[in-house]
Regions:
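Walker A/P-loop nucleotide-binding motif
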Residues: 1
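Short, well-ordered coil/turn elements that cap or connect secondary structure elements
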Residues: 12-14, 111, 153
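Walker A/P-loop
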Residues: 4
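Conserved substrate/cofactor phosphate-moiety recognition/catalytic segment
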Residues: 11-65, 126-132
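Glycine-rich phosphate-binding loop used to anchor ATP phosphates in small-molecule kinases
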Residues: 52-151
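Conserved phosphate-donor/acceptor-positioning beta-strand/loop module used by diverse small-molecule
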Residues: 118-120, 137-179
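Hydrophobic anchor at the start of a short beta-strand
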Residues: 16-18, 115, 156-158
């Protein structure tokens, strides 16, 4: 749909802005990041001791949680990335109440300006609410009403990329991501 292309152009033309791609540790989004307790993090370090240093380089501590941008860890250890998926907040890994608390708390704490986010605020959260929590449109709208109440006083813009030909866009994406 052009999200990454647009992000690359914005990054090139606005170098003073901090760019957050999907998989980065973002102040508003946790897609492709693990969200672990300290105990879980220590267990992962023990299980994957050969890459524990890399884990540390891609991990931040927020309150009582360790957030790891695990897809940024390059390794040939079979199954590592799949193993780390279980610690994401998406894909139904946590109950909706906790999911909502984590996301809305991130929105509340977010006060920075000068950022550009890829796939944030809607894509991953809506997908999770539809596919994993099987929420109705009204329930999803209720979530976003709460989100809007939190975000309405903050200084940012939300861009929507309208796809004119959905079928050919899906075909292009399939070809690009064949692996």
């Amino acid at each position: 749909a052009g999200k990454s292309t647009l992000l690359n152009k914005l990054q090139k033309n606005m170098p003073e802005y901090k760019v957050y791609r999907e998989g980065d540790i973002s102040p508003v989004e946790l897609a492709w990041c693990s969200y672990m307790t300290s105990e879980q993090y220590e267990e992962v370090c023990i299980q994957y001791r050969d890459i524990c240093a890399d884990l540390g380089l891609h991990t931040v501590t927020e309150e009582d949680r360790k957030i790891t941008a695990y897809t940024q860890i390059l390794t040939d250890i079979l199954g590592f990335h799949k193993f780390m998926e279980q610690f994401e907040i998406y894909n139904g890994n946590i109950d909706f109440k906790q999911f909502k608390e984590v996301i809305l708390k991130r929105y509340e704490k977010f006060n920075e300006i000068g950022n550009v986010f890829e796939c944030s605020f809607f894509q991953n959260s809506i997908e999770c609410m539809i596919l994993y929590y099987q929420m109705s449109d009204d329930e999803i709208m209720d979530f976003y009403s709460k989100a809007f109440d939190i975000l309405k006083g903050k200084k940012f813009r939300l861009l929507y990329l309208k796809v004119m030909d959905i079928e050919s866009t899906i075909d292009t994406i399939k070809r690009e991501r064949i692996d």
